[in-house]
Amino acid sequence: APPRANPPPSAALSPRTVFYSVTGSKQLLDIVNVVYTDARGFPVTEFNVALPWTKMVVLNPGVQTESVVATSIYSRLNCGVLNAQGQLVVASANNSIIATCTR
């Protein structure tokens, strides 16, 4: 199943808000790293994250890329990108060691 996130009420959100999510089963002693596109359009890496992982980002004007990539050695990962209205705009539900969601 595609990952789901529960964004706060959209009335207070910028239309440029995106929600990144990574779900799955993290194996004992495995490390899950996540790379996502930040507000300026640059990649940011978070190391050894807990699952489920979510991040809210308000993209600067002109930033078009919405991306989250999760990697591991053994874990089974899925990812998703939701827009400000909470709609899933891209998802990967492959339960694999790498999950890529880019729009």
Model-inferred region functions:
Residues 54-103:
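Extracytosolic low-complexity repeat regions of secreted or lipid-anchored proteins
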Residues 14-16, 51, 75:
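Residues at beta-strand starts and edge strands
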Residues 23-72:
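Mature extracytoplasmic domains of secretory-pathway proteins
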Residues 1-17:
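N-terminal low-complexity, Pro/Thr-rich disordered segments
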Residues 16-24:
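A short, amphipathic beta-strand motif
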